[in-house]
Amino acid sequence: MKTTILILLILGLGINAKSLEERKSEEEKLFKLLGKIIHHVGNFVHGFSHVFGDDQQDNGKFYGYYAEDNGKHWYDTGDQ
């Protein structure tokens, strides 16, 4: 009787451990997916702010010029 209970207990723990491992892999997949979504949303918001001029300082770097600097460029245009 004790042996039967012990065997059933061990089998039950094995099933729970397998279930736990399956849940861990599903959670890891979910966290990776959420990380990718957050990353892409951040990229979208950053690009959106450049296009619509929320930060003029960054726009100057993005487009390669500042109007108030009389055409000074952040990169070599070859005509200087």
Curated annotation (Swiss-Prot):
It holds the Pfam family Clavanin. It is found in: Secreted. Residues 1-19 form the signal peptide. The keyword Secreted applies. The keyword Signal applies. The modification Phenylalanine amide is found at residue 52. GO terms for biological process: defense response to bacterium. This is Clavanin-E. It comes from Styela clava. The lineage of its organism: Eukaryota, Metazoa, Chordata, Tunicata, Ascidiacea.
